[in-house]
Every structure is written in C-alpha cells, then in structure tokens.
Curated annotation (Swiss-Prot):
This is Translation initiation factor IF-2. The keyword Cytoplasm applies. Belongs to the TRAFAC class translation factor GTPase superfamily. Classic translation factor GTPase family. IF-2 subfamily. Residues 437-440 are annotated as: G3. HAMAP family: IF_2_B (MF_00100_B). Residues 491-494 are annotated as: G4. The lineage of its organism: Bacteria, Pseudomonadati, Pseudomonadota, Alphaproteobacteria, Hyphomicrobiales.
C-alpha cells in the first residue's frame, strides 16, 4: 500500500482525549431523626467545580481555598495539537512517496483549517462565558453562606431569649401560686439546666476541615445533612450515619418545629421545647390567673331608639346570653338578633351597673337652628313686613307704590300668584324694610301661612269700598297664630264709595280694635293709586320695629326660610330665601329640608349678583341639588358630611311619612273592593308648575273638588317644564297634563301629539280649577227626576187577537201619554214598571187622554193585567250634575 500523504505536510490533529463536561453534582443520602422515633431520609447533593481542559494534572488541594476566595481565571483556549513535521531523513526511512496535492485537496484542507479556526474562536468564547458564570456562582455561594451564618446566630439568640422568658415565667408563677416543685425541675419534667445545652450549641462543621466545594454548597439546601470529610485519597464524600435518638420519655413535651439549617446540622443535640408547648404553658398560667376575682368594668353605653341584643351586649362588654337571661327573668323571650326599644335597653344596662346615654336619630339636627346668640354680639336688623289681605284689595299695588315699581302689570290676570320678597329704603329715616307680598286667593292659604311665620309685622290691607272679606279673616288668624303685631292699611280711600269707618267697625268682630276706637292696633288710610299717606305707613312700620327691638348676630352661620322654590331650565334649582340670622355667603354648604348644596350664586331682589346676604335680606340661592320645599328652614353647616347626615335623616323621615299614609289607605285589595262598592271614578292628572308654592296651591284646590263619586287622581306633580317622561306616564293612564306657567319641550310636545295626549297650559289658577271642575262634572252620573202625569183605573180586560190583552181604563186624574213610563199597582203594591206601548180612544191611536175619559192601554212585554189595578203614568227627566 502506498501512502499518498506528501512528506512534510502539516495536518490537523485532535488531542488524544475529547473535551467533555463531567457532572458537577455528587449525591449522597443521610437520615435525620426527630422526636417520637420519626426519621427522614434526605438526599444531599455535592456540587463540584466544572473544569475545562485536557489531561493536565489535578490541582493541588492546598490551592482549594484560593478558589473560594477569588474567581478562577479563564483557562487558555484549547487548541488542536499539531504533529511535528518529519525530516527528509525520516521520510526516506519510512519509505513514503511524496507527491504534490491537487487543487481539490488544497481547497479541502483550507476549508478544514478555516473550520478549525472558527471552532477555536467559539470554544474560547464559551470558555470565557463559563468562567464568568463560575465567578458569579461563587459570589452567590458566598452570599448564601453569610446569610446562613446570620440565620444561625439569629436562631441561637431567639432560643436564648425564649429560655430566659420561660425561666422568668416559671419564677413568677412559683412566687404567685407557691408551687412546691423543686427549682431544678420546670413544669414539663425536663432538667432545669437545659439552658446549658441550648445556649451552647455544638460547634458547626467549619469550612477548613472539609473541601470548600462542600462548604460552598452547604447553604443551598437547609435540609442537607452533614457530610463526612473526604479522606486523604480524595475519595467522594459519604453521608454520615444518622445519630441515635434517645428513647422518648413518658410525659416529655412534643418536639415539633421547623427544620432549618441549624437544626439539620445539630440533629444529634438535645432539642429544646417547641413554641406550641410554651403557648400551652402560658395558657395554663392564664387559667390560674383567671380564678382571681376581676374588677367590674363600668362603661357609658350609648343607647339609640332601637338596638339589637347583640349590639347592646357588645357596647356593655357583656355576654349576649347574660342579656337574654335578664330579659327572660322579665318575662320576655328574645333571640340574639332581636331588636329591643331604648327603655328596655336602658333597664338592662343600669341593672348590669353601666351608665346609659340616650340618643335619637334626630340628634343630627341638634345645633342647626335656634342657637342662642351672645347679647354683646347682636346688632339691630331690618324689620320683615308681610302684606296680607283679600284678593283685589290692592296689596301688590301698595307695594309697587312703596318700591316705585310696577309688578302688577307683569302678573297674569292682574292677580298675584307667587310669593315675592322685596327690600325698600325709607326716604326719611334711611332704614331698610323687607316686604313679603302674599297672594290673596283662597287657594294660597299655605303661602299666607308661610309669610306670617317669617315676618315681624303684618300689614293687613282692607279695601275701603269692599270691607272685611273671607281672606281678610284668614290673614287675621294667621297673624294671631304667629304672634306678630298688625298694622291695618285701609286702601282705596280715593274711591267715592269708600267707607273707612265701616272697615274699622267690621274689624271689631274679629278682635281687631284700632287706636281710633280705643285699641292698640295702628291703622292708616292710604291710596296706592294716588300714593296717599305712604310716608305715614312707613313711619308706623319703623315705629313698630323700634318697639320690637329687633337684633341679631351677623357674624354667625346663616339661618333662613325658603319662601319659594322652583326648577329653572337654565340655572337649575333656585330657592328664594329670607335670611333671618347670620350672613349667607357664596361657597357656604347649606341644608334645606331634604336637599343640600353649595351656594354658587346669590341674586338680590333687584337682579344683581351679590357675594353675601345679611339678616332680613331676601335673595335667590343657586346651588341646591334639587328644589327644596317651600317653607323649609335653611341652615349653613360646617362640612358636606354633616349635610349628608341631616339630609339622609330627613329623607328617611319623609319616606316613613309617605309609607304611613299609604298604609292608612289600606291594601290594594281593600282599595279595589272599596272602588267596586262605592263606584268612585278617578280623573287622572299630571300637574307641572313653575314654583313650589303654585304647585301646592293647585294640588290643594284639586283635592277640594273631590266627592264620593268622583275625585282628581294626581299621578305626578312637580316643578319644572313638561318632559317626555310625563307624556309617557300620561299615555299609560290616559291622563291629562296640566302645565301652570310652564311649557313642554320639543320632544314632549311631539310625543304628546303622536300619542294623542292632551296638554293644557294655564297662567291663572282660577281657569285651571274651573276647567278641571267641568271635566270632573262630566264623570258624574246624571240625576233622574220623575214628573207625575196622571192615574188611571182598569175597568175591564179585552183579548184582541192581533194586539193581545188590552186594558179598558178610565183616567181618574191628570193625563196619560203614549210612550210614557207607567207603574202597575195592585193592592198598593207595584207589580210592574215599564212603558205604555198602546193608547187608544175608541179605535183611534191618540197621544194623550185627559182626565175623566176612557181609553184602552197596552204595556210593552207585559200582559198580566187585572180589573181593579191602578196605572200611574209619569215622565223621567235627566238632569246633568256639576261639582
């Protein structure tokens, strides 16, 4: 065989031993023993160092610590070994024949060399990465060893602290209860000198007595057992045999605890008492201490209007069963969740030795109103004057003359239907007077009552030509109920038929005695049209206010009364408020009835925006969440939380009141049965008004129209424009929508036209009430009136083949008409009622027969007639009723 290799050619040769990665983890098994003969086998892994290289000699053991302390530098890159080029003599001796390489062989060798260089670069890169990884791993191992040492020291410190605590507790218990137990033996039967074994643990295996690799990996697993050090020959580590466990003594405490690195390395030591054992001992000591008599705790128990037994027991720090036992002694059987009243709760709490503080849900309103002011902080304020009287007696005209305004021309129908508040400055004294104008119509009783409540003085306007009228008497009663003085203004004295003296005399009937007749009521004759004696009227008002000595504190939080409220489309809920005490400012948090809000703007009676309003100043307030009720009291609170408490309580009261009214009406079945028996008809209505006062007056007037046969049923009533939801509600109940000084929006009008719902608009309350009255009158059943025509007596009965039985009669009185209603009376008993179908005189049909004449009669669908019967003839008239 001829060798084709060229002598002296450089060939690529690989090392005799391939480059491999040996497993760096050696495993061993060690058995750990626990209390009560329990044991556990734990697999211990020993991680060795990963080495990259050939068959170089092993590193000496002395250099091992160096590896732990600093990272091993990267080994040199492994390069393929090259064979030395043989000399020409060697080639001659070998007998090889050399020849020149072909082009293909050269290219193949070049490719192999290039691949070898690429592999060399890749192996060098991998070696560098491995060196970096080993360095990082060594840093992590070092940190874990340090952390394990810190945990071991902390565990030893905790054991020492627990032993010291137990020793102190045992000493204290012996002092208190005089236990006869020897001091050397604690309560669990173990020797008292266990502190020597717990405080001086066995020296742990140091890293100098075993290879660093094992020490570095010891912190990787807390469950790893101890390893036997490696022998001189450097053999693999073998697990140490498990230590022998002493026999468990009867009565010994259970040795339970968490397995940590320290406990695993010191498994052959005597283990200390567990935490659970210490807790049980503490509980026993507490049980002994509980036998001592305890001092009774007396608490102040807050008792609301209703409280459950469980809550009462919690507030008294008593057991609920004790409270139930006391209730059983009083003859009341209750469960733990039952609710008892405040009186019963107070009796139980006082019997148990506690003090009781009674509270109510209405306590949230304490401090809102009627807070007494310091007399040193009060200042004089303007008087509030309410103008009252009968309709068309000139109340608004008198106010216009005082204000130099013209409000009457803007009123619909020339009558006042809204309550208004204005402020007038006296030209002589310069003092300001607040006037409140009230409607005089009978429907606005509530408005007049509100005006009398918030006023200081009442001006009773009486027309000199009309005298005292019903609403005049009502105004007098309102003023007397409010306890305010009256000034009588006799108006329209410029008329020819004016009789002021007659007015003064008529007032005497209602206990109003003017000064000219020896009384104490001031009267002034005025003319609003000619502005006569207006200065005298203002002078009397100022004099009366001076006698009242009106003072208030302006620097306190504001209080007032809502005179009127409405829902403005552009501004939202708007309330006309008369400030009575304090100063109302923009930004204040206010509460009125069940509504709250923050003052966004204040508008005076002249239409100007103001920043604040003092006492006796009427303003429009913007910023409520919803329109309050007219007559609600307004107050400023400190924060929104308090405002929410007050409004939620008032809303709850309002719901309860509405529910009680519904409950009084009875159940649905009772209402339906009552409807069937009485036959009462309802007229469904939806009412929308511009302000609360007008809505209140309309509802009151409609309620008065109801009778036992027909009544107005208000499906919905509110303030604001007519919306599409109102039309939808009206469609469901076939109701009529009434709008007072409001209009329907575009969508609502289109929906009403599409569904055939009638919407009626009114500006005068008289017209609204009259139209509803006429519509309700149409639901009334008409009245039937009988008109007697005459009587006839049957003389003989004839049988006619074509007609049947015909009674031959004589008319005794009156007349008998054909087609009239008749009654057949036999022995003074009505036996038949019907109509007269046939009336003949001789053989002719006639319309009527006069008294004294004879005729023939036949009834519709009745033939049982006898001689001697009496026939009554009468006519029924239908009369339409009205309310």
């Amino acid at each position: 065989m001829v060798d084709t290799k060229t002598p002296g050619d450089k060939t690529l040769s690989m090392p005799t031993k391939t480059l491999t990665l040996k497993p760096r983890v050696e495993q061993g098994v060690v058995r750990q023993s626990f209390s009560h003969g329990r044991s556990k086998q734990v697999v211990v892994e020993k991680r060795g160092k990963r080495r990259v290289g050939g068959d170089g000699p092993a590193e000496p053991a002395a250099a091992a610590p160096e590896v732990v302390k600093k990272p091993t530098p990267a080994p040199p890159a492994v390069s393929p070994r090259q064979q030395p080029r043989p000399s020409p003599q060697q080639q001659a001796r070998s007998g090889m024949v050399l020849r020149t390489l072909t082009e293909d062989e050269r290219s193949a060798r070049a490719t192999a060399l290039a691949d070898a260089r690429v592999r060399e670069v890749e192996e060098r890169r991998l070696a560098e990465i491995e060196a970096q990884r080993r360095a990082a791993q060594e840093l992590v191992d070092k940190a874990e060893r340090e952390a394990a040492e810190v945990r071991r020291k902390a565990e030893e410190e905790r054991h020492r602290h627990e032993e010291e605590t137990k020793r102190k507790a045992e000493t204290e218990a012996k002092k208190r209860f005089g236990e006869a137990e020897p001091a050397k033996k604690p309560a669990d039967g173990r020797p008292a000198s266990t502190s020597t074994t717990t405080t001086a643990p066995r020296a742990p295996v140091t890293t100098t007595t075993r290879p660093p690799a094992v020490a570095a990996e010891a912190g990787d697993d807390d469950e790893a057992p101890r390893m036997v050090r490696r022998g001189p020959g450097g053999g693999p580590a073998r697990p140490a045999p498990p230590p022998k466990q002493p026999a468990a003594k009867p009565g010994a405490s259970k040795q339970r605890g968490r397995l940590t690195l320290v406990t695993a390395l010191t498994a052959d030591d005597v283990r200390e008492r567990s935490i659970a054992s210490f807790r049980r001992r503490t509980q026993r000591l507490k049980g002994h201490a509980s036998n001592e008599p305890k001092e009774k705790l007396v608490r102040e128990v807050i008792v609301p209007e209703a409280i459950s037994i469980q809550e009462l027991a919690n507030r008294m720090s008593e057991r609920a069963v004790d409270v139930i036992r006391m209730l059983m002694k009083q003859g009341a059987m209750h469960k733990i969740n039952d609710v008892i009243d405040a009186d019963t709760a107070q009796l139980i709490a006082e019997e148990l030795g506690h003090t009781v503080k009674r509270v109510a849900a209405s306590d949230v309103e304490e401090g809102l109103f009627d807070v007494v002011d310091n007399s040193t902080d009060t200042e004089p304020r303007s008087p509030v004057v309410t103008v009252m009287g009968h309709v068309d007696h000139g109340k608004t005209s008198l106010l216009d003359a005082l204000r130099h305004a013209n409000v009457v021309s803007g009123e619909a129908g020339g009558i006042t239907q809204h309550i208004g508040a204005y402020q007038v400055t006296s030209p002589e004294t310069g003092t300001k007077i607040t006037f409140i104008d009230t409607p005089g119509h009978a429907a606005f009783t509530a408005m007049r009552a509100r005006g009398a409540k918030v006023t200081d003085i009442v001006i009773l306007v009486v027309a000199a030509d009309d005298g005292v009228m019903p609403q005049t008497v009502e105004a007098i009663n309102h003023a007397k109920a409010a306890g305010v003085p009256i000034i009588v203004a006799i108006n329209k004295i410029d008329k020819p038929d004016a009789k002021p003296e007659r007015v003064r005399t008529e007032l005497l009937q209602y206990n109003v005695q003017v000064e000219s007749l020896g009384g104490d009521v001031v009267d002034v004759e005025v003319s609003a049209k000619n502005k006569t004696n207006l200065d005298k009227l203002l002078e009397m008002i100022a004099l009366q206010a001076e006698l009242l000595d009106l003072k208030t504190n302006e620097s306190r939080p504001a209080e007032g009364t809502v005179i009127e409220a409405k829902l403005d489309r552009g501004r939202g809920p708007v309330a006309t408020v008369l400030v009575q005490r304090g100063t109302l400012k923009v930004g204040d948090i206010i509460v009125a009835g069940a509504e709250m809000g923050r003052v966004r703007a204040l508008i005076s009676d002249q239409g100007d925006n103001v920043d604040f309003a003092g006492p006796s100043v009427p303003v429009e307030v913007l910023g409520f969440n919803g329109p309050p009720e007219a007559g609600d009291r307004l107050a400023v609170v400190e924060n929104e939380a308090r405002a929410r408490q007050v409004t939620s309580y008032r809303a709850h009261q309002k719901r309860e009141k509405a529910a009680s009214i519904v409950g009084m009406r009875g159940s649905l079945e009772q209402m339906m049965s009552q409807l069937k028996t009485t036959g009462r008809k309802d007229f469904p209505l939806i009412v929308k008004a511009d302000v609360q006062g007008s809505l209140e007056a309309i509802l009151g007037s409609l309620e008065k129209l109801g009778t036992d046969e027909v009544a107005a049923r208000i499906l919905h009533a509110g303030v604001g424009g007519i919306s599409e939801s109102d039309v939808t509600l009206a469609e469901g109940f076939s109701a009529v929508i009434l709008g007072f000084s409001v209009r329907a929006n575009k969508e609502a009008a289109a929906a009403a036209k599409r569904n055939g719902i009638e919407i009626r608009y009114y500006n005068i309350i008289y017209d609204l009430v009259d139209d509803v009255k006429k519509a309700m009158s149409g639901l009334l059943a008409p009245t039937l009136r009988e008109t007697m025509l005459g009587n006839a007596q049957i003389l003989e009965i004839f049988n006619i083949s074509k007609v049947g039985k015909v009674a031959g009669c004589r008319v005794t009185d009156g007349t008998v008409e054909r087609g009239a209603n008749v009654r057949l009376i036999r022995d003074n008993v009505v036996v038949h009622e019907g109509k007269l179908s046939t009336l003949k005189r001789f053989k002719d049909e006639v319309k009527e027969v006069q008294s004294g004449q004879e005729c023939g009669m036949a009834f519709e669908n009745y033939t049982d007639m006898r001689a001697g019967d009496v026939i009554e003839c009468y006519r029924v008239e239908t009369i339409q009723r009205s309310l």
